[in-house]
Amino acid sequence: MVDATPIRPRSAATVTKWDYEADVVVAGYGIAGVSAAIEAARAGADVLVLERTSGWGGAAALAGGFIYLGGGTPLQKACGFDDSPENMKTFMMAALGPGADEEKITDYCEGSVAHYNWLVDCGVPFKESFWGEPGWEPPFDDGLMYSGGENAAPFNEIATPAPRGHVPQMDGKRTGEKGGGYMLMKPLVETAEKLGVRAEYDMRVQTLVTDDTGRVVGIVAKQYGKDVAVRARRGVVLATGSFAYNDKMIEAHAPRLIGRPGAAIEEHDGRSILMAQALGADLAHMDATEVAFLCDPQLVVRGILVNGRGQRYVPEDTYSGRIGQMTLFHQDNQAFLVIDEASYEEGAAATTATPFLRAQPKWAAETVEELESDMGLPAGALQSTVEVYNKHAAEGSDPLLHKKSEWVKPIGSPVAALDLRGFTLGFTLGGLRTTVNSEVLHVSGEPIPGLFAAGRCTSGVCAGGYASGTSLGDGSFYGRRAGISAAKQN
């Protein structure tokens, strides 16, 4: 059990025997860890990865596989979309804040095309096809999709819409079992193995090891119940994931997720953050969280979402993660989908990757007035909402929230409502403050010697908002930087 207390380092002077040694030691074999291992090995370092579980993959291998890339990648161009680093940055600064790290986002956008090419060179496959329907991810093996609300209000007025959700090609994928994330991780691990990267499994990192100057020189881990000391001759890379499954840290830093299921894996217990904190590591955006909204987007887009007062509050055609944040943060987790019979049947028949998120209506009625009464909403509240919506929908517009005209249609009869109260879960976005070279920063602003980090144990490009693919995107991008930086150390 890990609590929220910083985990003190061990002095190298007390280590009588190093059980393992390498130039660069990487804690965690998910997307950030494997990317760090590849680049460190390519830089000539002897690399050892310590993985807590019995196999590689981490949360990345179970994910849908979105990697947020843009700026004019070959895949974007092949699918007929124009994009630029400047346009990508404009969207990310608007969508991932407030307080987004402009230096990191600029760096990420300018390096995005090269990062796509790096992934392809490592064997990650992308099919040159675009999926344009609403959804959490493509239901087939299409390689490109909108994954952050780029084509929805307000962002489609801030930056030119461009899809940036790049998905590794995989037939018969099953998110949570063997999804697109598996086809991201598999070729990267194979690349690492070809480069001579070693891996030790069932290694639960316990604490960092420092020398008398304060430099990080290793890790103590527990393997099969026994403490083992691992020496890092050049540097240690922390890549063990978020703190979504550390209840004490959630209570201390991200209380909006208290009681919400974690959209992560239970190994995400924040230990790397606590180990680095004991060395004086600075933290950033620890309250930031992504929130998933658990209703199939093919249904949501065809109705109207209302809160506990019967009022609309978000354009229904936007990114589901944005809907989740707006629902949990601003509507007390109260949400109902009001939809007529014809639209419900159309949405239920539409192709989707998430048919298991198609909830059944809880209430149905011939009129909105009856539905409102059955739902227990204030008299007239839902009626006025639907009246205003239908008035403009008859003209194909939504001047209130600016849902795109293709999804705007008057709500007819019979009409139903889905009870979506509490249909959210989330994961944390905050963590260690790092430089663009993935150096872990001390609260003084100086890098901690010998210590690097990437992935969800750090605060990456997301400071509050989110787009699907940014975790795997900046995890791999800054994982590479961590490996390069660690390998350069003397």
Across the structure, where does each feature detected by a protein language model lie?
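Extreme N-terminal leader/targeting segments of oxidoreductases
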Residues: 1-24, 42, 461, 465
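N-terminal Rossmann-like FAD-binding beta1-loop-alpha1 element of flavoenzymes
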Residues: 22-49
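Glycine-rich FAD pyrophosphate-binding loop
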Residues: 42-63
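Glycine-rich active-site loop/strand segments that organize a redox cofactor
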Residues: 69-108
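Conserved redox-cofactor binding core of oxidoreductases
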Residues: 107-225, 247-248, 393-412
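Glycine-rich loop(s) and the adjacent beta-strand/alpha-helix scaffold that form part
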Residues: 179, 223-293, 472, 478-481
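A glycine-rich dinucleotide-binding beta-alpha-beta segment and adjacent secondary-structure elements
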Residues: 207, 215, 381-465
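An anion/pyrophosphate-binding glycine-rich loop and adjacent beta-alpha core
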Residues: 269, 273, 282-381
